[in-house]
Amino acid sequence: TKAGYTIVVATNQSGLGRGYFDIMTLNARHQKMQNAHKAAGGQIEAIFFCPHTASDNCDCRKPRQGMFSTISERFDTPLEDVPSVGDSLRDLQAAFLAGCTPILVLSGKGKKTLENGGLPPKTIIFDDLSAVADHLLEADQKNSASRDKNTETP
């Protein structure tokens, strides 16, 4: 993105494994999401999905961290403290297990997730994705100003 973030999506799509929709339908949904991000000035670098059902007992289905491990390997980036946004408990659990900072958005299923409790430690909560983006950009500006202040010479 313009702000220097790499946006990656990790999504459970058991409907594919159950035969509710095919890969072409899923790709069309993903393209729609990418187009919406692009229209807002963002860019999704990659979309990772798990097509398995819970009974398949795979490593990639959230709340397991398999997709996150794949993302870390593919982008050659450790995920410690990387912000990870989701609206379900399993999103947050997978993020926490991978060492990310779990961020709950109250849009989508987020309000119900908050009501049900059991959030991972240090979960940060925002109203929506826009509020998350604003927070991250503000934090970056503060960190940049702090670095600039620390490198000034008298």
Predicted regions and their residues:
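Conserved Lys-Pro-Asp/Glu-containing loop-to-beta segment of HAD-superfamily phosphomonoesterases
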Residues: 59-92
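Acidic, Mg2+-coordinating phosphoryl-transfer loop and its flanking beta/alpha structural elements
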Residues: 84-124
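Intrinsic-disorder-associated, low-complexity terminal segments enriched in Asp/Asn/His/Tyr and depleted
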Residues: 148-150
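Short glycine/serine/threonine/alanine-rich loop segments
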Residues: 5, 42, 77, 100
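Short, hydrophobic alpha-helical segments
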Residues: 75, 133-143
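Substrate-recognition element of Asp-dependent hydrolases with the DxDx(T/V) motif
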Residues: 1-30, 43-56, 95
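Structural recognition of alpha->loop->beta junctions
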Residues: 29-46, 115-137
